[in-house]
């Protein structure tokens, strides 16, 4: 095989690899279609995934350490026996949120030039919607804030359009959580900025 044919085959394989990488990487990580932009975007995406894995592994370790050590003998726990624990969620001042909310559901929002954060009660969970420009590493920051506040992430969806990103969370309210919805949105907003003036509305 001639040198020209070898080079042509190498370029073809490289283009196929780049095409595969681009299809596996969210579009907002790749600003242009050239090789450097694709590889750079993939590296950023992998770094953020690695950070997310570290957060989840840390969460798993904490759950393991907090697991009761006494044996259960494979007994079945009836839902009725958990009623007090599952229904009395100490989500403080929820009554005030319910009476002042302008949403059709119980909700609050907190906006800044950097992000719009909205939280709503949905059954025993909270639906959190965050719209912002793309910031590398921001997803990990939000998840860290939620875990610090005793929320458990049940579902996460990410969508984007050019430089704008929408993070959609469904989170479970932890028994140790004592925040109102307004305080939750404010804490998430703080993960974006530290010195900006943040306006909270409900």
Swiss-Prot record:
Transmembrane feature ranges: none
CDD domains (alphabetical): bHLH_AtFAMA_like (cd11448)
Domain bHLH: 1-49
A single GO cellular-component term on record: nucleus
Signal peptide: none
Keywords, ordered alphabetically: Developmental protein, DNA-binding, Nucleus, Transcription, Transcription regulation
Database matches in PROSITE patterns: BHLH
UniProt keyword Nuclease, yes or no: no
One GO term (biological process): guard cell differentiation
GO MF, any single term: transcription cis-regulatory region binding
Superkingdom as given in the UniProt entry: Eukaryota
Tissue specificity note: Leaf epidermis and flowers.
Chief location bin: nucleus
SMART domains membership: HLH
Presence of keyword Nucleus: yes
Subcellular location: Nucleus
Pfam families: HLH (PF00010)
Induction / repression: By UV, flagellin, and jasmonic acid (JA) treatments.
InterPro entries reported for this sequence: bHLH_dom, FAMA/SPEECHLESS/MUTE-like, HLH_DNA-bd_sf
Function per UniProt: Transcription factor. Together with FMA and SPCH, regulates the stomata formation. Required for the differentiation of stomatal guard cells, by promoting successive asymmetric cell divisions and the formation of guard mother cells. Promotes the conversion of the leaf epidermis into stomata.
Subunit structure: Homodimer.
Name of the protein described by the UniProt record: Transcription factor MUTE
Organism: Arabidopsis thaliana (Mouse-ear cress)
């Amino acid at each position: 095989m001639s040198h020209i044919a070898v080079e042509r085959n190498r370029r073809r394989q490289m283009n196929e690899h780049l095409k595969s990488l681009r299809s596996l990487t969210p579009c907002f990580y790749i600003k242009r279609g050239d090789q450097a932009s694709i590889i750079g975007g993939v590296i950023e995406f992998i770094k953020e995934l690695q950070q997310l894995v570290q957060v989840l592994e840390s969460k798993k370790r904490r759950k393991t350490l907090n697991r009761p050590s006494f044996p259960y003998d494979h007994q079945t726990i009836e839902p009725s026996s958990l009623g007090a624990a599952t229904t009395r969620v100490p989500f403080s001042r929820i009554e005030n949120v319910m009476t002042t909310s302008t949403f059709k559901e119980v909700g609050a929002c907190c906006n800044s030039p950097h992000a719009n954060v909205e939280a709503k009660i949905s059954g025993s969970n909270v639906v959190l919607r965050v719209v912002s420009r793309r910031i590398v590493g921001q997803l990990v920051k939000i998840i860290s804030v939620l875990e610090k506040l005793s929320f458990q992430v049940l579902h996460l969806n990410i969508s984007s359009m050019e430089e704008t990103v929408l993070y959609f969370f469904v989170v479970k309210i932890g028994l140790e959580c004592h925040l109102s919805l307004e305080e939750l949105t404010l804490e998430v907003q703080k993960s974006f900025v530290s010195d900006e003036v943040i306006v909270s509305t409900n």
